[in-house]
């Protein structure tokens, strides 16, 4: 990772932290959908990175492969990953058949007993492919296991699968019997 990429990565991490977990520490007041004023958000980021511009933030939003952020009507929010309650208006995924969840092996026993819970978040994050799920699991440790999730099973049990990004799906909970394999 080059220096420019490293700086972009660090700013993006701060953006995600603020928008997903603690806007109040930066004097931001999210609305019920998690949006904050974009200009105020840029000023909040400048408290840590004084050189940041609105254009730099918008470029991060535009280039983000996981589509973590959304800008609308002069406001910005995280599209998923919140640890505080937000109302999300994402479209429902009615097409996916198999989804994937990356975790570490140490979590497997509890998951196979209780299902996949959102833990400190509002939703469980699922991926459309093995590689993305594996990379998500790697953030938590090196002994990664990827679980295969039957999306139709989730739907039959009344769980809505939401499209949080092109390759990211979110759901309130994954029951044990909807986990159909381990890779």
UniProtKB/Swiss-Prot annotation:
Q: Which top EC class is given?
A: transferase
Entry-linked SUPFAM superfamilies: ADP-ribosylation (SSF56399)
Question: What's the superkingdom here?
Answer: Archaea
Q: Provide the alphabetized UniProt keywords.
A: NAD, Transferase
Known InterPro entries for this protein?
Ptrans_KptA/Tpt1, RNA_2'-PTrans_C, RNA_2'-PTrans_KptA, RNA_2'-PTrans_N
Q: Name one GO molecular function term.
A: NAD+ poly-ADP-ribosyltransferase activity
Q: Does the keyword S-adenosyl-L-methionine apply?
A: no
Q: So where does this one cross the membrane?
A: none
Question: Record keywords: Transferase included?
Answer: yes
Q: Which GO terms describe its biological process?
A: tRNA splicing, via endonucleolytic cleavage and ligation
- Its EC number is 2.7.1.-
Which NCBIfam families does this UniProt record tie to the protein?
Answer: PRK00819.1-2
Per the similarity annotation, which family is this?
Answer: Belongs to the KptA/TPT1 family.
Describe the function of this protein.
Removes the 2'-phosphate from RNA via an intermediate in which the phosphate is ADP-ribosylated by NAD followed by a presumed transesterification to release the RNA and generate ADP-ribose 1''-2''-cyclic phosphate (APPR>P). May function as an ADP-ribosylase.
The record's listing under PANTHER family reads: PUTATIVE PHOSPHOTRANSFERASE, TRNA 2'-PHOSPHOTRANSFERASE 1
Q: Quote the protein name from its UniProt record.
A: Probable RNA 2'-phosphotransferase
Q: Write down the species.
A: Pyrococcus abyssi (strain GE5 / Orsay)
Q: Cite the source lineage.
A: Archaea, Methanobacteriati, Methanobacteriota, Thermococci, Thermococcales
| Gene of this entry | kptA
